[in-house]
Amino acid sequence: MILLNPVVLSVIVMTVLCLLKLNVLLALIISALVAGFAAGMPVGDIMGNLINGMGGNAETALSYVLLGTLAVAINSTGVASILSKKIASLVDGKKKILLIVIAVFSCFSQNLIPVHIAFIPILIPPLLKLMNELKLDRRAMACSLTFGLKAPYIALPVGFGLIFHGILSAEMSKNGMEIAKTDVWKSTWVLGLFMIIGLLLAIFVTYNRDREYKDLPLKGMEEVKATNMEGRHWLTLLAAIAAFVIQLVTGSLPLGAIAALAAMLVFRVIKWKDIDEYINGGVGLMGLIAFIMLVAAGYGNIIRETGAVTELVDSIHGMIGGSKALGISVMLLVGLLITMGIGTSFGTIPVVAAIYIPLCLKLGLSVEGSVIVLAAAAALGDAGSPASDSTLGPTSGLNADGQHDHIWDTCVPTFIHYNIPLLIGGFIGGMFF
């Protein structure tokens, strides 16, 4: 029975526990145990695979803590306060303009300057006071940020999108359906369009009403007010730019963050004696999320070790018969479960392509329709997953004052506004392209 599959069972348990507001860290550990026990693994092997798998996100976790430290250090110079004032004057009291500006800025982090979530702990916490003044519902801001972290790599062959499209092209070609990497976007733009619809619904309909928040201090940060750009502020920006350049050249986000902190010390923007304070503040801001990413990698490792993903994918054949509509629907839903389980849309493609592409050929799907189904099946579950950086990133910035719930204010809104449109877009694309 498909409900007893370790992947399905553990994802359901994780979802229920998170919705009941159990800490995500504990929910992941319990879900990992459920997956292991359901697959008949000894408890020692389960914990061994959990711990061994954590290394998969070690660099990400270190990046989060160092980015938090950098964010606290930058905030201490007052440049964040100036940036907040500049953005406030730009949006001129219009919260919808702010949401769209942040969505566009977030998109740039995936292609124009591919730094992924690195900008969030630096840019978003200083803007919380402005959001409070505008009575902006932070659930809308979570949707804006997640849109920018997801839509560009799905729809555009630039930055992280080029990697995603390259994996799609390679796996499809390997399994009997040729498509050039540069042609993938000609199909996946449909999914991007449906995500834009989800974003607009979140901004203009679902979270349009005012929402009150208190002006509370930020975790690990002291408010530093500044009005005009001075020499130390320009040097701080120079250090931040250096971090991005080093990250782009070396491919190492931790190295970029360390370089920025070193530059700020050399420029005497921050003091040696304050480094401990910045580290403690960075851990306070990003520490929990870093640990969640570690445990999420361990959970994903257990899911893979059970062999249940292959069983789940293989079970599709017997479920759909010759129905094109049912086949597409099942492929999308199974993709959703797998991505929520292993935690990466990029990693889902190789797992499902070996079964999905022959199945698409059998059902008579076109190359374009198959691209859409495979891309949607992989991308589903990234938004809305409690352990995805597409949700943890936004929460890290929006919860800097402790007033933003990860599950109900980030995961649930982004799941509704992006996974449902992706399901619809994937189904329509598969059926009619």
How should each PLM-predicted stretch be described?
Residues K95-S109, L134-I154, G176-V184, K324-I338, ...:
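Alpha-helical transmembrane segments of multi-pass membrane proteins
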Residues G56, T60-Y64, G148, K186-L199, ...:
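Alpha-helical transmembrane segments
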Residues I2, V7, A38, M177-Y278, ...:
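Long, contiguous bundles of hydrophobic transmembrane helices that form the permeation core
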Residues M1-K95, I203-L218, F432:
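N-terminal alpha-helical transmembrane segments of multi-pass membrane transport
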Residues L128-L216, T391-F433:
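Membrane-core helix-loop-helix motifs of multi-pass transport proteins
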Residues L4-T15, L22-P42, A61-T69, H233-F244, ...:
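Hydrophobic mid-bilayer segments of alpha-helices in multi-pass membrane transport proteins
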Residues V43-N132, D276-L361:
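Membrane-embedded alpha-helical segments and adjacent helix-loop junctions characteristic
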Residues L4, V8, L26-I29, A61, ...:
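Hydrophobic alpha-helical transmembrane segments
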